[in-house]
Amino acid sequence: MKYMVLVDHPTAEGILYKGEIVREYENKPNGHIRVKDNMGRIWFVPKNILAKKS
């Protein structure tokens, strides 16, 4: 499933920018989701900053 990032999400490893398209990598039940960006980096982000993309 593809998602679009709604707001910038800074982490210790870098920043996931608003408008970037990411793919679901692994889903966790605690309200977070693990996604992979177009560079292959894996991010652990809250679901509320993502919007489903068709």
Spans of features found by a protein language model:
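A short, compositionally biased micro-patch
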Residues: N27-K28, N38
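Exposed beta-strand and adjacent loop surfaces of beta-rich binding modules
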Residues: K2, N30-H32
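Boundary regions of SH3-family modules and the immediately adjacent low-complexity/disordered segments
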Residues: M39-S54
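SH3/SH3-like (including bacterial SH3b) beta-barrel domains
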Residues: D8-Y17
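Conserved beta-strand/loop element in small beta-rich adapter and peptidoglycan-binding domains
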Residues: L16-N27
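SH3/SH3-like beta-barrel fold
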Residues: I33-D37
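Short, structured beta-strand/loop micro-motifs enriched in basic residues and often containing a Trp
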Residues: M1-D8
